[in-house]
């Protein structure tokens, strides 16, 4: 079996009024009584090389065709009708601006009517077929008319060739809706899909691929055709006898990537129906995006999905002799067809960018309008396979960035966000830093978007445990079943995998918070909600969260004490490492209460560690001596074993605490003095004896009594607190006790 694609010379059909297949030309011996040697172009006008004067003028755009009525009347039903209906004197003037294919197609159709040989190629056959349909050149007027012969060329030549099918489909872009109505687009799409899905074992054909290294293609005295172009692709022909190599699974990516987005979608849809592996479908979609949206893909080509990379790396599992291709210069002997130029590259510079350029600048450089950009993004979103890991998470996030920038339909953006949530653990910080296109400049980055992605991830993690994960087609149903399957982390849905994914996402979120915390416009609520979105079990260490909190405090120095405490509540001090604790102990931006919690938690951890160590040592020693006496270290032993740096931090904290306690005692003393003065005033008031045993005096007296009792109680509580502080190792003189006054009403 072989797909022949060496039709550069213009494979065609010829006929002597009948159905004969010649050597690459389309002709008719019936010239309607007008003998001609050909057509002549003079400026913007075509003339028939004959002595008979022209009696028909056809205008198509800027071109004029000076023809004769009879050759066209005998083969075109539309021309027959238009000329009959026309009341113009000779020469009859017809304007056919709506003719599909334009002046080029009408020129070929006119030559066919005059019996001039016409070269049929993959680049002109679709326009000529549509023009023949427009002109109604059917079999009713003549056997072997233009419709029949162009259909024969399409069916027997084009559709059997991979390269010609691509070229014809590309040429149909300017022939809508004629190419659609004549099923040219559908037939070419299905032909391409069938060839792309066929197992390449034992099949040889020509296709466009990436150029091999110069050391393998630098032939003496010759220059390969693919090397004539600056493009990185080349033409692989089955007729070359050079070093053979197995065909990679992505051999067809480069060719289908030149198609317009609507035709590309038709091809991918047909390929999907035939059962192509979802990894290959995802890889070709990323390849297409790299061609038409160069700012979307990182420099260096398409990043193949994890499963796809293992498939390509493992190869097809075929022997080198079972299927091979030959790459080299294309034969030019007798070829009058279109120059292949190393591949089907009508958008050669689409995928070549130096560095990470802005998406808008790259797209503008291609001359793609915003409307077309939006159509490309929406179409790519709609054809991404539903299976997890069909495309990389990095690609999805870049596509999401472009979708937000181009104002894509909200339903498609929501669907894309769910896809990102399915594999959110594969994301990187650089991909998450998506500018806030829709928040009217409130924040530098779209934090709400990351919050939604995280919610989709958590929902996905919850459903994975209860329902089977999205499984790929079984090997018996998958295209290229012998390709080794990569480890997608896609099956099982075990708790261990889920927990590891949550831990990776937690580290990613902490890094993201550290980056966006520098934005002065970021509200505290958004920071707190994103930090608390993950469950506590997702973080075994809160160092990353502490780093993000510290960055937020640096960028927002005007936060109140309450807001700083509220911010620090998202962090668990017991999950901080020793380095983070030492940094927090000296961090003046943290509230004092948080610093004390950090130091206390670290001291508790050190005490427990020392206690466990001493307990193990005593247990080992007791077992060796035959006795077991557990040794509980006292406070002095623990403090002496504490690292010096930690003791210094704890001493500074204790000094601050003692200062606060001293100030509190001063306030209490002043309060007691005021209480004494108040009681003296009360007694003086009672001795006046102006009004006795009245409701008002009773109220005053009871009020003073209650206030006195409350004062004594608060004094007693403060005394208990200070006593507790002394027990904790703080040496202060006991507070002065207030004199006990006898309260009497006399």
Curated annotation (Swiss-Prot):
Compositional bias of kind Basic residues: 735-746
Q: Which residues cross the membrane?
A: none
What induces its synthesis? Answer: In the root, up-regulated by red light.
Effects seen without this gene: Impaired leaf flattening and slight epinasty when grown under blue light.
One Pfam annotation, family name?
A: NPH3
The UniProt PTM text for this protein says: Phosphorylated in the dark.
Q: Does the keyword Phosphoprotein apply?
A: yes
Pathway where this protein functions: Protein modification; protein ubiquitination
Membrane topology designation: Peripheral membrane protein
- The residue ranges flagged as biased composition, category Gly residues, are 9-19
Expression tissues: Expressed in hypocotyls, guard cells and mesophyll cells.
- InterPro entries the record matches: BTB/POZ_dom, NPH3/RPT2-like, NPH3_dom, SKP1/BTB/POZ_sf
Q: Does the keyword Transport apply?
A: no
Q: Where is the composition biased (Low complexity)?
A: 466-478
Record region (Disordered)? 1-24, 461-500, 708-746
Q: Which GO terms describe its cellular component?
A: plasma membrane
User: Which residues get modified to Phosphotyrosine?
Assistant: 546
Q: Which residues form a coiled coil?
A: none
| Domain called BTB: residue spans | 54-122
Name the keywords, alphabetized: Cell membrane, Membrane, Phosphoprotein, Transducer, Ubl conjugation pathway
Family label: Belongs to the NPH3 family.
Q: What does this protein do?
A: May act as a substrate-specific adapter of an E3 ubiquitin-protein ligase complex (CUL3-RBX1-BTB) which mediates the ubiquitination and subsequent proteasomal degradation of target proteins. Signal transducer of the phototropic response and photo-induced movements. Involved in the phot1 pathway under low blue light (LBL) fluence rate and in the phot2 pathway under higher fluence rate of blue light (HBL). Necessary for root and hypocotyl phototropisms, but not for the regulation of stomata opening. Not involved in chloroplast accumulation and translocation.
**Family matches, as PANTHER family:** OS12G0117600 PROTEIN (PTHR32370)
For this entry, the protein name equals Root phototropism protein 3
Identify the taxonomic lineage of the organism of origin: Eukaryota, Viridiplantae, Streptophyta, Embryophyta, Tracheophyta
> Quick one: which gene encodes this?
RPT3
């Amino acid at each position: 079996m072989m797909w022949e694609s060496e039709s550069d010379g213009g494979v065609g059909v010829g006929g002597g009024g009948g159905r004969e297949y010649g050597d690459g030309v389309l002709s008719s011996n019936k010239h309607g009584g007008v003998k001609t040697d050909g057509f002549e172009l003079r400026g913007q006008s075509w003339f028939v090389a004959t002595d008979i004067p022209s009696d028909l003028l056809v205008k198509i755009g800027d071109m004029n065709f000076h023809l004769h009525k009879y050759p066209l009347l005998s083969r075109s039903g539309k021309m027959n009708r238009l000329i009959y209906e026309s009341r113009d004197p000779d020469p009859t003037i017809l304007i056919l601006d709506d003719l599909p294919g334009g002046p080029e197609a009408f020129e070929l159709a006119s030559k066919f009517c005059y019996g001039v040989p016409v070269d049929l190629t993959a680049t002109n056959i679709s326009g000529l077929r549509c023009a023949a349909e427009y002109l109604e050149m059917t079999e009713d007027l003549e056997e072997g008319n233009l419709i029949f012969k162009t259909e024969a060329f399409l069916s027997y030549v084009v559709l059997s060739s991979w390269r010609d099918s691509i070229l014809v489909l590309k040429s149909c872009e300017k022939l809508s809706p004629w190419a659609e109505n004549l099923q040219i687009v559908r037939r070419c799409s299905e032909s391409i899909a069938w060839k792309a899905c066929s197992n390449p074992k034992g099949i040889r054909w020509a296709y466009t691929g990436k150029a091999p290294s110069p050391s393998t293609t630098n032939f003496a005295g010759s220059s390969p055709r693919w090397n004539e172009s600056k493009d990185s692709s080349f033409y692989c022909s089955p007729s070359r006898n050079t070093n053979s190599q197995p065909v990679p699974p992505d051999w067809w990516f480069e060719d289908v990537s030149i198609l317009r987005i609507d035709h590309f979608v038709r091809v991918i849809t047909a390929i999907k129906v035939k059962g192509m592996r979802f990894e290959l479908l995802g890889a070709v979609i990323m390849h297409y995006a790299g061609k038409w949206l160069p700012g979307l893909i990182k420099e260096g080509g398409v990043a193949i999905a994890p499963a796809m990379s293992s498939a390509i790396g493992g190869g097809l599992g075929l022997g080198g002799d079972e299927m091979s291709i030959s790459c080299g210069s294309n034969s030019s002997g007798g070829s009058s067809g279109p120059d292949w130029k190393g591949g089907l590259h009508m958008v050669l510079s689409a995928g070549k960018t130096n560095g990470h350029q802005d998406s808008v600048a790259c797209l503008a450089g291609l001359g793609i309008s915003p409307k077309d950009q939006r159509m490309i993004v929406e179409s790519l979103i709609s054809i991404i396979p539903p299976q997890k890991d069909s495309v990389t998470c990095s690609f999805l996030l870049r596509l999401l960035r472009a979708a937000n920038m181009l104002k894509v339909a909200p339903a498609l953006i929501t669907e894309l966000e769910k896809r990102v949530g399915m594999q959110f653990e594969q994301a990187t910080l650089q991909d998450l830093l998506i500018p806030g296109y829709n928040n009217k400049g409130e924040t530098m980055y779209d934090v709400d978007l990351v919050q939604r992605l995280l919610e989709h991830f958590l929902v996905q993690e919850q459903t994975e445990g209860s329902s089977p994960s999205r499984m790929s087609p079984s090997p018996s149903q998958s295209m290229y079943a012998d390709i080794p399957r990569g480890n997608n982390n896609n099956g099982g849905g075990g708790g261990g995998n889920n927990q590891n994914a949550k831990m990776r996402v937690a580290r990613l979120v902490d890094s993201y918070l550290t980056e966006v915390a520098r934005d002065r416009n970021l509200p505290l609520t958004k920071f707190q909600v994103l930090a608390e979105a993950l469950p506590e079990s997702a973080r075994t260490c809160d160092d990353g969260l502490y780093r993000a909190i510290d960055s937020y405090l640096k960028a927002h120095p005007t936060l109140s004490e309450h807001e700083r405490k509220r911010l620090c509540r998202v962090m668990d001090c017991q999950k901080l490492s020793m380095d983070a604790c030492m940094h927090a102990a000296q961090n003046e931006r943290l509230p004092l209460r948080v610093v004390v919690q950090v130091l206390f938690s670290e001291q508790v951890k050190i005490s427990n560690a020392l206690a466990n160590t001493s307990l193990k040592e005593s247990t080992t020693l007791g077992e060796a001596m035959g006795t077991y006496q557990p040794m509980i270290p006292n406070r002095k032993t623990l403090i002496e074993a504490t690292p010096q740096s930690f003791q210094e931090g704890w001493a500074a904290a204790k000094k601050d605490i003692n200062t606060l306690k001293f100030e509190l005692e001063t306030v209490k003393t002043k309060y007691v003095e005021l209480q004494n003065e108040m009681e003296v005033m009360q007694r003086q008031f009672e001795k006046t004896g102006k009004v006795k045993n009245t409701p008002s005096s009773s109220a005053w007296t009871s009020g003073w009594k209650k206030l006195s009792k409350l004062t004594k109680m608060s004094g007693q509580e403060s005394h208990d607190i200070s006593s507790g502080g002394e027990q904790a190792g703080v040496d202060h003189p006991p507070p002065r006790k207030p004199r006990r006054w006898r309260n009497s009403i006399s």
